Amino acid sequence: MKLSQIFKFIVLVTLVPVTAFSASVDTVVTYSKVMKKEIKAVVVKPDSYSAAKKFPTLYLLHGAGGNYSDWVNQTPDKNTVKRLSDELSMVVVCPDGGVTSWYFDSPIDKTYQYETYVSAELVAFIDQKYSTVSDRSGRAITGLSMGGHGALYLAFRHQDVFGACGSMSGGVDLRPFPENWNIAKRLGKYNENPERWDANSVINLTHLLTPNKLAIIVDCGTGDFFYKVNVALHDKLMDRNIPHDFITRPGVHNFAYWGNAVAYQMLYFSKFFKHDQQ
């Protein structure tokens, strides 16, 4: 290689921008009074974070079998959530969901009261500890799989707390899966307690919604085992004239899909935050 070519190569290399994600990741320990135990959460703060400004917050829930660290450790690009937090200037909170809590208050197990924990105790902790917008205009919630169910469930039932919600590959109807993911341990057996399964399936909570009260985004891959129940939820929302974004594309139930989907969801929430706070 000629000297002039080497020089050109060096110049080109030095001109390539280096992207640094400066978002900070805290692991915090919260205490649940209702469950009488400590629960961990990851909190991602954007590089622009300052106590002098109030930041919107996204609550990002993990799936069955996962934990609070999944969203910063399991996506193909482990910087995904940090990068999006930086780019969109939002705080991201990833709580632990007790492996298979399904994010509701179990009627049979007092150690699984995750609806109360996430929608009340955790939100109060975050608003006290961090500089956040402390009303529904600055809060969104989404998640994957079990967390997708949980996010919609909590937002539908607590519209005074969350202004926007989403789901990625969410298990939005529990009833087709009576033997899976410890749901029966939280609600009792389906054939013995069908009313509990009905009452705690997101697809049966659309009557709580009124048009334009909640910003809603639902995403599920066509190869996902939850695809049919997501289409059914979409159809039910359409029948009730509830505006929402519904995304479906080729994909299955894995982090490759969710690592892509979360970018669309966070952009959607960023637009909601900007619009609602104007």
Stretches found by the model and what they are:
Residues 2-12:
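Sec-dependent signal peptide recognition
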Residues 12-21:
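Hydrophobic h-region of N-terminal signal peptides that target proteins for export
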Residues 22-278:
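Non-catalytic cap/lid and distal C-terminal segments of serine-dependent acyl enzymes
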